[in-house]
């Protein structure tokens, strides 16, 4: 689903506005993620876990209805042998490999982190029903800075610098968790730092993939990108649980920080996509 959505946006939005369009998608994902953390305990108490799955199915049906009302976009067709060649090219494209490594690492780290943060908050005597008081402000404040920062980076041609800076911000958050996870207030501040970097990366990565991939295989490149993201989510959840059981919270923080260090090293070889003209009224 996420691959189809990002591919549709890539095909429908002008390149000058692509990063901001992806930012809106990333912001909606961030708000949805936070809302799920807030509402899940309430739903679990009222309708139970089976009810949550039924609610998810209902929301999927509503999403299908919304998609059916969209106008049909023109389809570009390619021969099968060309599609196979392009799949190989997408996997072996050095710049796309760096971006795919990035989204894999980012979501692996996010899932591993949120294996332990709820447990740590509970250890600090914050009841589950009050966890939203930590998550929601961190996400909303971080989103307030997202669009101005992205717009400035686009206009000044400093997309790569912003990208690497956002990774460093996430790394700083994990380093902070290693030292300052002993109070709810400090965890709240560090989550704000984390989401400030995370939201920039979440918005920038699909746009960079779309701009980097060859024109005829953007959808394929975004499909590989989203698959890599999903694999990162799965492995991150599993790795976070195992690391917590063996090494505790600090083992998880250290693992996430190591992922960000590796990503920063890989990102040094990135080449920023050609800068498009930014319209004055955009």
Functional labels for PLM-detected ranges:
Residues 45-58, 242-260:
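A membrane-interface helix-boundary motif in multi-pass transporters
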Residues 71-102:
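Juxtamembrane intracellular "pre-TM" segments in multi-pass secondary transporters
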Residues 161-175:
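Structural signature of the two symmetry-related core transmembrane helices
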């Amino acid at each position: 689903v996420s691959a189809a959505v990002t591919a549709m946006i890539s095909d429908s939005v002008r390149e000058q506005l692509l990063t901001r369009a992806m930012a809106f998608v990333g912001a909606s994902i961030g708000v949805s993620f936070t809302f799920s953390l807030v509402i899940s305990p309430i739903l679990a108490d009222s309708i139970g876990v089976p009810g949550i799955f039924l609610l998810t199915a209902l929301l999927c049906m509503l999403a299908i209805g919304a998609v059916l009302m969209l106008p049909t976009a023109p389809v570009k067709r390619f021969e099968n042998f060309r599609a196979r060649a392009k799949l190989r090219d997408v996997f072996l494209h050095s710049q796309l490999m760096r971006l795919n490594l990035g989204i894999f690492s980012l979501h692996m780290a996010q899932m591993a982190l949120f294996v332990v943060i709820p447990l740590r908050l509970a250890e600090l005597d914050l009841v589950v029903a009050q966890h939203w008081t930590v998550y929601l402000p961190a996400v909303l404040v971080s989103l307030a800075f997202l669009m101005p920062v992205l717009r400035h980076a686009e206009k000044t041609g400093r997309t790569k610098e912003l990208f690497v800076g956002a990774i460093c911000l996430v790394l700083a958050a994990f380093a902070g968790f290693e030292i300052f996870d002993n109070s709810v207030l400090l965890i709240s501040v560090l989550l704000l730092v984390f989401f400030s970097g995370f939201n920039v990366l979440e918005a920038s990565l699909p746009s960079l993939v779309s701009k980097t991939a060859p024109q005829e295989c953007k959808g394929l490149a975004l499909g590989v990108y989203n698959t890599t993201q999903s694999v990162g989510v799965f492995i991150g959840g599993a790795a976070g649980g195992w690391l917590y059981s063996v090494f505790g919270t600090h083992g998880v923080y250290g693992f996430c920080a190591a992922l960000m260090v590796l990503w920063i090293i890989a990102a040094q070889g990135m080449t920023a996509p050609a800068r498009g003209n930014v319209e004055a009224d955009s």
